[in-house]
């Protein structure tokens, strides 16, 4: 493994990349859950006789105290196998006090079940791995903003936003008065609010820096007493109700000073103290009079240009809510419901017999937690396509979800990259489409602090010297604004002194330059700005951001291949990404390997403890149907150290991420087969399994209890030949190892059928012979259309074995089918620079363009895909990969290498190519002179002639993406129709048709293809009578009759009529005297027959009809010039026939 000649700064090892998930969940277990229980304790009944106390305080070192989590019933692997949830029971110590008798009852009460996090940062809910995405929301606190009215007068407003409770908004107007709105209600004078809080005039004026500004507001309202102010407050908030002083008092208390109704949260209190320079204790989570006065004071100061307004998109004002906090909020919802139930039970039951266990019902808490994990927008099915996808999913930041934004309301400002994102949120990795900017990814070195604000690490700089010896300092976006921060690629000498005269710095969100002695901090590494996926792109700085975004997103869609191959050109972050994803097995201790097999590794630790057994995953199915398989990397007798990779997982090789393959590419056009991003590949990629991947599909069937009796899993299936049952065992379940194709039976199942289900011929047989034909129907599980493969696993679940089954099911059988998918035309492949394309042709090896030594290239890419897309990084990568192959080394390049001098990338690549040329003695590898620098003479495989121009050839790292043509290709003959419009449904899952949209209609109109157009809009779509008649005509070999009225036209007419528009359809008829009459057509004439299913009738088909008629034979011979004429004659003959 050769390092580059240019010294790359060693990035400090990243923090643990899944830390954000694990730490947050641990906080919930240690503090969050306890905090919630304490906030509800004690629960007192309506008469005040009974009190129920929760005593969940966690005492480290004293296991008798605190709430207890029982051992989970299943381990994570078993939970996955059984489709169960990996969860544990929670028991909380409670105390019930009877005030009348003084009796005290203590006991541990079961309060509910809590899903536990696996060591990989995921949850297993009903057998599926899920991830709780981190939510980024506006932080509670006070926000000031300024607005210009239409006269150009500037007004200011302050919004006081709590964690939960009523909003308070103060605003100034053009007359210099201060108003307040409570929860967006009508305006109320701020003087009235302050008076209602019991403040005297002198107390108000003493606490303001500019009392003269507020005097106008006080004078306008007149001299209010506290009682009058409370009445006025009540009048404004509850118009229409008779105002009372006590009502006003209670309203004010409950809105802002009751901890149950109003909560600033720890963060809100911290932000409020910081912004307004207060020193209220952090435990005070409600508003105080001091807070309200300080908010008004700051607002008035803004009128005198003291202080500054806030930017709500600044990361100092947005915080991250991770798993722990989201779960805590959900527990609060459950405990609220529980509190109501406990109070009711206290009132209803006899107090002598009450125990804490009889009061506490675990259902509401269990339901709230289940709802959160099962259906919350932030609880997502884990993206398990490859290790990077899994890692990125756990580090995702979403602005959507409950309490966040919605796609429709989010404007440009929220989505935009903000200067404070620097080093905290990746400016590149975000989805394309409606979620752009709302979903981001945490930067590589960023971490979330105790308040939920994102911090980024820096080294301190003193007098122009970078002090790495002092360790890293983590700063939030707010703190960083006060300092001059230099980027991580500033040139420094051996002592750490900055060598440049002027350094680019960021200061107060501006990018400027400064002298080295003025710099306060310097970034830890150049990659700390970007996310993990983005930092895996080599030569990132030479790619346009839009393409880098696609490159980062497409790496997450790469399918793990059969033979993983590390990139020749990497960035050095592959190993850590693979390790933290949890897909590789890592040694926990130093020791010696004592046993290795395909499915387990045993290590004897050096400290003499028990041997550690590491179980490997073998051919498991991932959430995305890719194959999870781990392969041992160590041998018996090897010494291992803690943190060493013991076994590779999917898409990793040697403990490094290996998402794709290093293939030989040439940038040249080839017979138009790489027009518009299409890609031409060599047959070698198919034969050598270069881009072959394994996919595992799951098929499931339930045997249920029906009204007519139980369904049965059996081999005895009616009307099925022995051939179709050849792979089923005696129970009717397919054997492991069988090869199955579309339509084959996987599990035989028969369902009892009632009298009504029997066809007429069966009823006739029973009437004549009186025997019961076996009254069951075939309901077997079959391989779906377009799928095939080998059965790799069969799992049977029954109640007798103690499995939990869905209600009504007696038995569940699950069959897993694996298939090797070779690369084929229509598959999508891509590079790491956003250069994606569809395979258009697979060419025999001998026809591919070849090099001077006879090596055929693997992939031919279009050179026109580079200049307009501006992702030149792919060219650098392909040339450096070319040098790497000939030198027999792999390169690791940190992105942003310009710190080593101008054009460092180009000079490095050139130097390595020269070195390769000299070492191998092959002069044709690199041509350093002239305008063809870096290009090679390539020969046409078909003729052996050289191509006109030299061509860029090299080793590029290409990925096969999960968008495989096998999963997308789909055809429909007849199938389901939409109920209202009667048009075919859309989509593969619905067995749907292809949409013929308005633009396609325009195309046919432009060609004047009237009959094709008419068919497409009627008999092939929603003319119900016409399509049945057309099918009958085709079956009988007769000409297709004229189409009728489309159903959607009838729907349109009915909709217009429902808007009270008199719309009707008329036709002009001519009578025998030549007079024209206007006749209204009843489009709904056939509604009486609508309840019959729309399918063709075969009653009138005779055996003569089914033999190919001359008319039908003539239709097939379309080349015959007389065909059209003979069809017209046939039509005339058949007019009389009753269809």
Curated annotation (Swiss-Prot):
CDD domains: RNA_pol_B_RPB2. Its EC number is 2.7.7.6. Belongs to the RNA polymerase beta chain family. It is an enzyme of class 2 (transferase). One of its GO terms (molecular function) is DNA binding. Residues 1085-1139 are annotated as: Disordered. It catalyses: RNA(n) + a ribonucleoside 5'-triphosphate = RNA(n+1) + diphosphate. GO terms for cellular component: DNA-directed RNA polymerase complex. GO terms for biological process: DNA-templated transcription. PANTHER family: DNA-DIRECTED RNA POLYMERASE I SUBUNIT 2. Keywords: DNA-directed RNA polymerase, Nucleotidyltransferase, Transcription, Transferase. In cyanobacteria the RNAP catalytic core is composed of 2 alpha, 1 beta, 1 beta', 1 gamma and 1 omega subunit. When a sigma factor is associated with the core the holoenzyme is formed, which can initiate transcription. Residues 1086-1106 have a biased composition (Polar residues). Residues 1128-1139 have a biased composition (Acidic residues). DNA-dependent RNA polymerase catalyzes the transcription of DNA into RNA using the four ribonucleoside triphosphates as substrates. This is DNA-directed RNA polymerase subunit beta. It comes from Synechococcus sp. (strain JA-2-3B'a(2-13)).
């Amino acid at each position: 493994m050769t390092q580059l000649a240019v010294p790359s700064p060693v990035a400090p090892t990243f923090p643990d990349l899944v830390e954000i998930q694990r730490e947050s969940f641990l906080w919930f277990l240690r503090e969050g859950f306890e905090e919630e229980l304490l906030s509800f304790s004690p629960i007192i009944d309506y008469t005040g006789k009974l009190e129920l106390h929760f005593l969940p305080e966690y005492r480290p070192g004293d296991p008798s105290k605190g709430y207890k989590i029982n051992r989970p019933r299943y381990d994570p692997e078993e939970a996955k196998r059984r489709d169960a949830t990996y969860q544990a029971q929670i028991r909380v110590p409670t105390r019930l006090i009877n005030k009348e008798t003084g009796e005290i009852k203590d006991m541990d009460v079961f309060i509910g079940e809590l899903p536990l996090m696996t060591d990989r940062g995921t949850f297993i809910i009903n057998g599926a791995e899920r991830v709780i995405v981190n939510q980024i929301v506006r932080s509670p606190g006070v926000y000031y903003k300024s607005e210009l009215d239409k006269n150009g007068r500037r007004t200011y407003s302050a919004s006081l936003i709590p964690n939960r409770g009523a909003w308070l908004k103060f605003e100034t107007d053009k007359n210099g008065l201060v108003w307040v709105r409570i929860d967006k209600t009508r305006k109320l004078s701020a003087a009235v609010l302050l008076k209602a809080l019991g403040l005297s005039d002198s107390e108000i004026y003493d606490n303001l820096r500019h009392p003269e500004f507020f005097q106008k507001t006080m004078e306008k309202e007149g001299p209010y007493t506290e009682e009058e102010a409370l009445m006025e407050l009540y009048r404004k908030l509850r118009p229409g109700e008779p105002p009372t002083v006590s009502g006003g008092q209670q309203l004010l208390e409950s809105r802002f000073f009751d901890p149950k109704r109003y909560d600033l949260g720890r963060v809100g209190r911290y932000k409020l103290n910081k912004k307004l320079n207060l020193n209220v204790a952090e435990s005070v989570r409600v508003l105080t009079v001091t807070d309200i006065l300080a908010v008004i004071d700051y607002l008035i100061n803004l009128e005198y240009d003291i202080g500054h307004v806030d930017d709500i998109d600044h990361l100092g004002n947005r915080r991250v809510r991770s798993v722990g906090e989201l779960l805590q909020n959900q527990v609060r919802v459950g405990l609220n419901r529980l509190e109501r139930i406990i109070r009711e039970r206290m009132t209803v039951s006899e107090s002598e017999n009450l125990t804490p266990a009889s009061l506490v019902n675990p259902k509401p808490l269990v339901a709230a937690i289940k709802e959160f994990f099962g259906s919350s927008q932030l609880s997502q099915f884990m993206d398990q396509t490859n290790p990077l996808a899994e890692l990125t999913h756990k580090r995702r930041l979403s602005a959507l979800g409950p309490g966040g934004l919605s796609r429709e309301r989010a404007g440009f400002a929220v989505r935009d990259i903000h200067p404070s994102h620097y080093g905290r949120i990746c400016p590149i990795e975000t989805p394309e489409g409606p979620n752009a900017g709302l979903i981001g990814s945490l930067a590589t070195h960023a971490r979330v602090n105790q308040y939920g604000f994102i911090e980024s690490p820096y080294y301190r700089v003193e007098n122009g010297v970078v002090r790495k010896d002092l360790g890293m300092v983590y700063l939030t976006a707010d703190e960083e604004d006060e300092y001059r921060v230099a980027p991580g690629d500033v040139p420094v000498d051996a002592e750490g002194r900055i060598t440049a005269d002027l350094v680019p710095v960021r200061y107060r969100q501006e990018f400027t330059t400064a002298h080295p002695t003025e710099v306060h901090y310097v970034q830890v590494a150049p990659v700390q700005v970007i996310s993990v996926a983005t930092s895996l792109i080599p030569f990132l700085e030479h790619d346009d951001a839009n393409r880098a975004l696609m490159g980062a997103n497409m790496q997450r869609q790469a399918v793990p291949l059969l033979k993983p191959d590390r990139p020749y050109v990497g960035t050095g972050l592959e190993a850590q990404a693979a390790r933290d994803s949890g897909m590789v097995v890592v040694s926990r201790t130093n020791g010696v390997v004592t046993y290795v097999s395909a499915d387990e590794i045993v290590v004897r630790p050096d400290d003499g403890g028990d041997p550690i057994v590491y179980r490997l995953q073998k051919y498991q199915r991932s959430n995305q149907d890719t194959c999870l398989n781990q392969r041992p990397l160590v041998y018996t007798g090897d010494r291992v150290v803690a943190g060493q990779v013991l076994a590779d997982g999917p898409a990793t090789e040697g403990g490094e991420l290996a998402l794709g393959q290093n293939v030989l590419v040439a940038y040249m056009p080839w017979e138009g087969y790489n027009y518009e991003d299409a890609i031409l590949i060599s047959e070698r990629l198919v034969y050598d399994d270069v881009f072959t991947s394994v996919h595992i599909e799951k098929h499931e069937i339930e045997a249920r209890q029906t009204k007519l009796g139980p369904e049965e899993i059996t081999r005895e299936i009616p009307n099925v030949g022995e051939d179709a049952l050849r792979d089923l065992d005696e129970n009717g379940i397919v054997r492991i190892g069988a090869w199955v194709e579309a339509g084959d039976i996987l599990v035989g199942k028969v369902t009892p059928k009632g009298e009504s289900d029997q066809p007429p011929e069966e009823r006739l047989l029973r009437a004549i012979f009186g025997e019961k034909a076996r009254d069951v129907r075939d309901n077997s599980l079959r391989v779906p259309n377009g799928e095939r493969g080998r059965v790799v696993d069969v799992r049977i679940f029954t109640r007798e074995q103690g499995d939990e089954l869905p209600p009504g099911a007696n038995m569940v059988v699950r069959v897993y089918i694996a298939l090797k998918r070779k690369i084929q035309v229509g598959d999508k492949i891509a590079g790491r620079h956003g250069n994606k394309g569809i395979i258009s042709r697979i060419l025999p090896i001998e026809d591919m363009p070849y090099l001077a030594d006879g090596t055929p290239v693997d992939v031919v890419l279009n050179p026109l895909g580079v200049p307009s897309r501006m992702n030149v990084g792919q060219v650098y990568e392909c040339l450096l990969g070319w040098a790497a192959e000939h030198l027999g080394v792999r390169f690791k390049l940190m992105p942003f290498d310009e710190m080593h001098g101008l054009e460092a990338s180009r000079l490095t690549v050139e130097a390595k190519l020269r070195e390769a040329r000299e070492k191998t003695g092959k002069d044709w590898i690199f041509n350093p002179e002239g305008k063809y620098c870096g290009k090679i003479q390539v020969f046409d495989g078909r003729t052996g002639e050289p191509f006109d121009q030299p061509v860029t050839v090299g080793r590029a790292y290409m990925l096969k993406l999960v968008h495989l043509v096998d999963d997308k290709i789909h055809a429909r003959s007849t199938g389901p129709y939409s109920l209202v419009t009667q048009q075919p449904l859309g989509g593969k899952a619905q067995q749907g048709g292809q949409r013929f949209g308005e633009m396609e209609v325009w195309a046919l109109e432009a060609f004047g293809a009237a009959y094709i157009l008419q068919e497409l809009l009627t008999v092939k779509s929603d003319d119900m009578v016409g399509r049945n008649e057309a099918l009958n005509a085709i079956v009988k070999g007769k000409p297709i009759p004229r189409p009728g009225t489309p159903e959607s036209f009838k729907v349109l007419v009915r909709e217009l009529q429902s808007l009270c528009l008199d719309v009707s359809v008329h036709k002009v008829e001519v009578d025998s005297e030549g007079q024209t009459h206007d006749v209204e057509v009843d489009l709904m004439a056939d509604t009486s027959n609508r309840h019959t299913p729309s399918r063709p009738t075969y009653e009138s088909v005779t055996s003569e009809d089914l033999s190919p008629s001359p008319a039908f034979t003539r239709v097939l011979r379309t080349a015959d010039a007389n065909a059209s004429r003979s069809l017209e004659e046939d039509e005339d003959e058949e007019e009389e026939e009753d269809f």
